[in-house]
Amino acid sequence: QFDLYHSLDNNFVGSDKLFANDYGAVLCADDVNKYYRGPERFSICLKDVNGNPIVGENVIININGVDYKKVSDDKGTASLAINLDSGEYLAKVSYNGRFGSDSKKANVKVYETISGNDIVKMFRNETQFYAKFIDSSGNPLAKRAVTFNINGVFYTRNTDDSGYAKLNINLRPGTYILTAYNPVNN
């Protein structure tokens, strides 16, 4: 609180009380860990310095080099669906509006839903290709049909209880690219 004294004509001195409130915007953004095509979203909050939501303000979320403009809702929150390939990304959130400015950084990690290792096979030996399949929540994809493509030929195999599928490899010597398809998220 400040006491403000003023005079307009040197004969009369007036006084008023001036109240100064804290001013500023505070962003919050948490790290996100999700599986490919999972339902999790990148969420932010925008509040004033007293923790009250700031409503209807533009917030910029930059992820993977792309800016997304979101508007804070009645709770001061906004979110962005994460539809990125598996990998690690840095999300930068910024606000510059009527309530000041703030910025935050958060990490977004998208996990694979298929895992397998390169193999080296000697012609006609017993080495085979195995891959593990999981759903978008990280649970094994048990007893499901999955598809492999190698050398332009598609093969359908069923996973076991742990989400593993095996593909027998019987090809001439050479280098091949094998593509596995998860039926849950393509």
Predicted regions span which residues?
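Short Pro-Gly-centered beta-turn/loop motif in secreted/extracellular proteins
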Residues: G51-N52, A81-E88, N139, N168-T175
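Exposed beta-strand and adjacent loop surfaces of beta-rich binding modules
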Residues: R41, G56-I60, E88, Q128, ...
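Beta-strand-rich structural segments
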Residues: L4, Y35-G51, V93, K121-S137
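Short flexible loop/turn segments that cap and initiate beta-strands
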Residues: K47-D67, I134-F154
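Surface-exposed loops/turns
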Residues: Y36-G38, V55, D74, D85-S86, ...
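Enriched for extracellular/lumenal, surface-exposed ectodomains of secreted and cell-surface proteins
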Residues: Q1-D16, I63, D85-A106, I150, ...
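Glycine-centered loop-to-beta-strand initiation motif
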Residues: Q1, S72-L80, T159-L167
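Proline-enriched interdomain boundary motifs that mark the N-terminal boundary
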Residues: Y23-D31, Y111-V120
